[in-house]
């Protein structure tokens, strides 16, 4: 994928860029793999905002992605198309299996139309193939990794992300996450070889607020410019620093978002670096 820069014909176009979608081979999705998607604007069933800064945006249809890939072992599939997916940063690949079934997967870097992919313990180590961690050599770059056997891919799904398999010991494999964290995962968990494609997506300059609104993202207002009734940092005469350490709108200190007593914490070998405050 390459980035195409706009000419500065207006303030919103100056510096803005967009993907050239050179990897995408089809514009309309596979009808049998599309489901309706209803936006909720960050509201729950009572109509109250539970997730701020969401709402509006272009109408989308959900593409059903196969995150498990555990029921087609030994059945080869041909990459029919690389498609755009409005619901994620990565592109998706439409697979045509030899038995006639069609499925979507996350498109890895280097996968192109006409390639053949497979899944199962005996699959080759090449981008797009899906195997259990016990069958993948140490040092391999992988993505779409499960946290529990058969639970479906949970890790490294966004554009350009990848995980490195450092080694295996007993029933666990050690993985280096995109954050730098080193974590142990059951060797029965599956992963797909290669890194997620569309890595240049991170370099797109959106140019104007309106393009964010098309994506369903609303403005994020700083607490220091609010009134005291709306935020702990609000109020004061003139510009103020907030008068206290940074907190959320509900008074919780910023940072430290992880649950301290999570059962899976014992599988973390080395924590991610989180800066001077919390990285000690």
Swiss-Prot record:
Disulfide bonds: none annotated. PANTHER family: LARGE RIBOSOMAL SUBUNIT PROTEIN UL2M (PTHR13691:SF5), RIBOSOMAL PROTEIN L2 (PTHR13691). Part of the 50S ribosomal subunit. Forms a bridge to the 30S subunit in the 70S ribosome. It comes from Mycolicibacterium paratuberculosis (strain ATCC BAA-968 / K-10) (Mycobacterium paratuberculosis). The keyword DNA-binding does not apply. Residues 37-58, 268-280 have a biased composition (Basic residues). The gene is rplB. PROSITE patterns: RIBOSOMAL_L2. Residues 1-58, 226-280 are annotated as: Disordered. Belongs to the universal ribosomal protein uL2 family. Keywords: Ribonucleoprotein, Ribosomal protein, RNA-binding, rRNA-binding. The keyword Ribonucleoprotein applies. This is Large ribosomal subunit protein uL2. One of its GO terms (biological process) is cytoplasmic translation.
């Amino acid at each position: 994928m390459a980035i195409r820069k706009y000419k500065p014909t207006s303030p919103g176009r100056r510096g803005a860029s967009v993907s050239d979608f050179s990897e995408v081979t089809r514009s309309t999705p596979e009808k049998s793999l599309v489901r309706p998607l209803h936006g909720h604007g960050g509201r729950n069933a009572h109509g109250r905002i539970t997730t701020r800064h969401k709402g509006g945006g272009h109408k989308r249809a959900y593409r059903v992605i196969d995150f498990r890939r555990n029921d087609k072992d030994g059945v080869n599939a041909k990459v029919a198309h690389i498609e755009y997916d409005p619901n994620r940063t990565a592109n998706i690949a439409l697979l045509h299996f030899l038995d006639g079934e069609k499925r979507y997967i996350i498109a890895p870097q280097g996968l192109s139309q006409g390639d053949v992919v497979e899944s199962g313990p005996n699959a080759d180590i090449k981008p797009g193939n899906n195997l259990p961690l016990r069958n993948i050599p140490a040092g391999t770059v992988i993505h779409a990794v499960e946290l529990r056997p058969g639970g479906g891919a949970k890790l490294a799904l966004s554009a350009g992300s990848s995980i490195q398999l450092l080694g295996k010991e007993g029933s666990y494999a050690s993985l280096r996450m995109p954050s730098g964290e080193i974590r142990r995962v059951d060797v029965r968990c599956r992963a797909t070889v290669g890194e997620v494609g569309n890595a240049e997506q991170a370099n797109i300059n959106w140019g104007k607020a309106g393009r964010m609104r098309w994506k369903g993202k609303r403005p994020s207002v700083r607490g220091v410019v609010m009134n005291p009734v709306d935020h702990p940092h609000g109020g004061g005469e003139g510009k103020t620093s907030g008068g206290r350490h940074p907190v959320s709108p509900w008074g919780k200190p910023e940072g430290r978002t992880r649950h301290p007593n999570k059962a899976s914490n014992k599988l973390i070998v080395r924590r991610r670096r989180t800066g001077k405050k919390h990285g000690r």
